A protein has these predicted regions:
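A generic structural signal for tightly packed, nonpolar segments enriched in small/aliphatic residues
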Residues: 7-204
Length: 204
């Protein structure tokens, strides 16, 4: 399993090699930003969350406003108190595939010196069970003030993404794309032949 601290370390190494910048927010900074979704999911963990910001901004960028990529960084997902069956938990170390995709994209854009202003955001935690873990019927507050009543602790991806999407608004982005392993229902629909997509911009 890839711990979020190790993920951030790898990102910093890649940033040095390929030329993008990286900033890692610790728990104190996340609390200051009032990221209740990320903090709520992290309550059951014995290690703190991180929030990672990757930036590729060349001087010749063709876009003044950034393209923002948001990746779900749940490093291991037990489902929390809405516990997954054991056979569904086997591959949950890959629940950070969205985070990996965002980091890989930033790396590729920087390595190829593409003239695009791109920001990557990765909220990172795991979703575990403990005496402190969040439970069904808890009310949490996202960083933009939106309140959420928890009905299933295994819907944690939406919560961490909500804080990241709220954070992205400050950049006035040209386009936002989030990437996440959110539901097995998507695989039931597409199998291995595609991905489930939704959006509000037909021209994107």
């Amino acid at each position: 399993m890839l711990f979020r601290s190790k993920f951030s370390e790898l990102a910093k190494e890649m940033a040095k090699e390929y030329g993008f910048t990286t900033e890692v927010f610790d728990k104190a900074k996340i609390e200051e930003l009032k990221m209740g979704g990320l903090l709520g999911v992290n309550q059951g963990s014995d290690t703190p969350p991180t929030f990672n910001v990757f930036t590729h901004k060349p001087e010749d960028a063709v876009n003044k406003q950034p393209l923002v990529l948001v990746g779900k960084g749940v490093m291991f997902d037990t489902g929390g108190y809405s516990l997954k069956p054991a056979n569904y938990m086997t591959d949950m170390k890959t629940d950070m595939a969205g985070a990996a995709a965002v980091l890989a994209t930033i790396m590729a854009v920087s390595a190829n010196k593409l003239p695009y202003y791109v920001i990557g955001l990765v909220p990172a935690t795991d979703n575990k069970v403990s005496a402190n873990a969040f439970v069904v019927d808890d009310i949490i507050t996202i960083s933009d003030g939106t309140t959420v009543e928890i009905q299933n602790t295994d819907a944690e991806g939406r919560l961490v993404l909500a804080d990241a999407l709220a954070y992205a608004k400050q950049f006035k982005p040209e386009l936002v794309i989030d990437l996440a392993t959110l539901t097995g229902a998507a695989a039931a629909i597409t199998s291995s032949f595609g991905i489930a997509m939704a959006g509000n911009n037909k021209n994107a």
